[in-house]
Amino acid sequence: MKKKKNILKKLFCLVLAGVLTAALFTGCGSPAGDDSGDTKKEDGADKTAGSGDDKKITVGVNPVPHADILENVVKDVLAKDGWELEVVVFQDYVLPNTSLESGELDANYFQTLGYMNQQNEDAGLHLAAAAGVHIEPMGIYSQKYSSIEEIPDGAEIGIPNDPDNAERGLQLLVQKGFLNSIGDYGRDENYTADSLSNDKEANPHGYKITPLEAANLPLSLPDLDAAAINGNYALGADLPSNYPALEIEEFDDETAVRRTNFIVVRQGEEESEKTQALIKAVQSDEVKQYIEDTYKGSVIASFIEEE
């Protein structure tokens, strides 16, 4: 929409070139009307050049629950204040950040602070958390058993295979009494899931710990006795409706912050008009009620304001 308006603006300038003054013509071609809509900071970060007349907010998201929350609630809340919301859905975790960095998005909404900080460091991005919205608790799911007490010694339990979520899944198993500890998992590269499976001190019930791609855990659930599954993948597979979690994560103040999904913007734009309008909408009573009514504990509101 912005590009279309800028093209029309330039055409308008060309048509009137013969009658307008040189100064007015130069004004039509000023940087503020550039099709890119952004200029580069000296430190390499992108800075959106949009003015107060731009009432459109473009946000990159993952499908569930992020897109649902924005499309079903936030869009209407923003409209009441005169804002238009465009939701751009991504299937991965990389493009929402690079698209935000390049100025194609005004914000994104899919990630935790830890992931954002890692991407800033590893990929040289310049992103900042603006406000927390929700937590997707990891849960212990099973198609074979209806309570954790039914799960027998030696059962096979799946966990995600990426480092952060693998440790998160194991800590959930500790929290719910399956394991005494995670042993040296994550601290000693020679200590594997097999090591933990055979560690009688950490794993007195002899559970077989099986790391799998996080997105594949719901598909693998029929072949496992149980699995620790991330909330977004559980929702995507409709597990909470068909096979409700036997247990879900509990959070103290520190872990709640670490597990919260944040609205993220480019550094320096945390206080912009667009960012503040978006924060107001995503942290509204309407969003909180929608989360409670729709997800019934598989998503939890976590309205954190970044300082």
Regions found by a protein language model. Name each.
Residues 130-179, 288:
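A conserved helix-loop-strand patch within extracytoplasmic ligand-binding domains
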Residues 118-130, 144-145, 223, 228, ...:
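Ligand-binding "clamshell"
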Residues 56, 63-86:
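Short, polar/charged alpha-helical segment
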Residues 1-56, 304-307:
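Short, low-complexity disordered leader/linker segments with a strong preference
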